[in-house]
């Protein structure tokens, strides 16, 4: 009987845990401690804890696993075949990495060695990559630097947002983990070292990077809009008021206007000049209003052409 311990926290990790429960069973789940959330600061449990409670699996929530002797001794006593890690949010010490028979396996949402780090899905889209995917790897003490095991690859379609790619990779990750576990048990996978010279780092997102620079090319602005949807959302200022942008498309036409200039407003959207052409803003949101397509917004509100977005 296979002994698997799962470590994960957000929604992204849920299908992986559910698939492993179905295929092998899971002996214990590690997830981040409950956190205060919302205005009432009510304690909120992680999506992974919800699954573990539902499935009646033992739950451990150490504040800092690497320093928690009780949790480490629990793992040593259990002596698992695998520790599977999907977006857990804590770094594992060498002492923990050495516990399982076959090793600690991580599912990472990029085609490693590209996009190591916290926000691989977003940066793949912001940088205009044509492909993305999941990679399983042996964990070592570095950040996403371990030997690679298996990959699945997807084409990033032209209008794919970070949210859509997140969901696609989230749903496919569990199957890749099952193949990885079976392959390691059967000794049919040849681990592959990462080439550090081909790596790049996907740093955490912050709201400062979400402000649109209209002096960039249309393609770069469109990629930023897609890559920051659903969070933190790219934005600009219309007459001093923040306008978030959910969706845009490039118009292949060069007009001689200053970047950020609103050329036209119609049901189809807001035409804005960029460094090399025109971007059509299709779905927007103003403070305290819901996101709307421009066609709907201009029925009851005015957006003037001739204004420069800042």
UniProtKB/Swiss-Prot annotation:
EC nos: 2.1.2.9
CDD domains (alphabetical): FMT_core_Met-tRNA-FMT_N (cd08646), Met_tRNA_FMT_C (cd08704)
GO CC aspect terms: cytosol
The keyword Repeat is assigned to this record: no
One Pfam match: Formyl_trans_C
Keyword field contains Transport: no
GO MF annotations, alphabetized: methionyl-tRNA formyltransferase activity
Catalytic activity, as annotated: L-methionyl-tRNA(fMet) + (6R)-10-formyltetrahydrofolate = N-formyl-L-methionyl-tRNA(fMet) + (6S)-5,6,7,8-tetrahydrofolate + H(+)
Family: Belongs to the Fmt family.
Function of the protein: Attaches a formyl group to the free amino group of methionyl-tRNA(fMet). The formyl group appears to play a dual role in the initiator identity of N-formylmethionyl-tRNA by promoting its recognition by IF2 and preventing the misappropriation of this tRNA by the elongation apparatus.
Protein name as annotated: Methionyl-tRNA formyltransferase
């Amino acid at each position: 009987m296979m002994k698997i311990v799962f470590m994960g926290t957000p929604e992204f990790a849920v299908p992986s845990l559910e698939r492993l429960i179905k295929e092998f069973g899971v002996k214990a789940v590690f997830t981040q401690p409950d956190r205060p959330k919302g205005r009432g600061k009510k304690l909120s449990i992680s999506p992974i804890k919800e699954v573990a409670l539902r499935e009646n699996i033992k739950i451990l929530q150490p504040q800092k696993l690497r320093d928690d002797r009780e949790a480490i001794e629990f793992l040593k006593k259990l002596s698992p075949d695998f520790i599977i890690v999907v977006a857990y949010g804590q770094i594992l010490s060498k002492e923990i990495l050495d516990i399982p028979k076959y090793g600690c396996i991580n599912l990472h949402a990029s085609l490693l060695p590209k996009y190591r780090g916290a926000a691989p899905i977003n940066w793949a889209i912001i940088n205009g990559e044509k492909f993305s995917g999941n990679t399983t790897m042996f964990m070592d003490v570095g950040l996403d630097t371990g030997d690679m095991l298996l990959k699945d690859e997807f084409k990033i379609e032209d209008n794919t947002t970070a949210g859509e790619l997140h969901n696609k990779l989230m749903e496919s990750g569990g199957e890749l983990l099952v193949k990885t576990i079976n392959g390691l048990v059967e000794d049919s996978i040849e681990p592959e070292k990462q080439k550090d010279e081909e790596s790049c780092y996907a740093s955490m997102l912050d709201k400062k990077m979400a402000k649109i620079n209209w002096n960039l090319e249309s393609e770069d602005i469109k990629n930023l809009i897609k890559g920051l949807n659903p969070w933190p959302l790219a934005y600009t200022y219309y007459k001093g008021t923040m306008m978030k942008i959910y969706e845009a498309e490039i118009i292949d036409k060069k007009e001689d206007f200053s970047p950020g200039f609103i050329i036209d407003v119609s049901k189809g959207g807001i035409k804005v000049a960029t460094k090399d052409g025109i971007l059509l803003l299709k779905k927007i949101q103003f403070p305290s209003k819901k996101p709307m397509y421009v066609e709907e917004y201009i029925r009851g509100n005015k957006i003037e052409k001739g204004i420069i977005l800042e």
